[in-house]
Amino acid sequence: MAFQPTEHPVLALPSQERMREFKKRGKKGLDELVEIFKKREELIQLERNDPFRYGFEPPNWGDADELWADASELLIQGGNRAGKSEYAAKKVIRMLTGKKNAKVWVLGMTAQSSIRDQQPLIYKYIPEEWKNLRKTKVQNVSYSQKNGFTENTFVFPNGSQCWFMNYSQEMRVIEGGEVDLIWADELVPLQWIQTLRYRLITRSGKLLVTFTPVDGYTPTVKEYINGMKILETKESPLLPDSVNVPGCEIGHMPYVAEGRKASSKIIWFFTSMNPYNPITEMEKTLKGETSIQIKLRAYGFAQNLTGNQFPKFCHVHLLAPED
């Protein structure tokens, strides 16, 4: 049976032209080509088996890491299937593996959505050798696809522990705890955000918020976006001909911003930034949609549609007194 290389969105196959160059060099060239294919297959298998160590990280993940280093809160708004939850899940595991006795909360909409969406991603990024640990007085990692993590928690050999909670619970479940990292995913209520901040003070923890703003300009979105300073923009091929957001040049959307507090940072993960998700399907789906929907679904940006007296007024119109 002929060898069939595994498809991969990042690890490209040698071009036909390059393979012909190897063939011209005879057996030595063909042997080198075989090694290239073999190494590629090995890398793909490593990524499948241990994505924590060998998974591909797109450039926007590195940009988010830089913001994270100097921020106490990071909001990642993203288009559909932009990879924001993948990033957050890996960030959770980095904290749990990198700090002894770390404490992390992972919050979602409901218990069911936590088992369906967040917990499989967290399990995916657990280092391979820790996925099937023998239970002891400390370590306990028990997961099933049907029920998620046993009792909505797990503990690593280094004493680090993660708990899963959701916004359908009474808010008192988050009173009194002290944690190093909180990941709040999808439509977190503002009242929860305001309470969660106090759970991070003692351990100098950080808050990571991720969602696609499908409900528009909610109080939580306003908490971060209102009064922000756009630091960087990127081209928006699906919206190329107009000023899409005040403070951006024509044909661009916000990419990085600073919130009203300098310790609060914002980054937008565009759907096109995730190589594992075919952007062509998103383009087909959004064809004929309004610019509001395109901004939201492809770029993760929620537009404030309330009747502001000066709707195009933003930080770029503010001048220092000497100006």
Locate predicted features:
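Phosphate/NTP-binding elements of NTP-utilizing enzymes
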Residues: 2-323
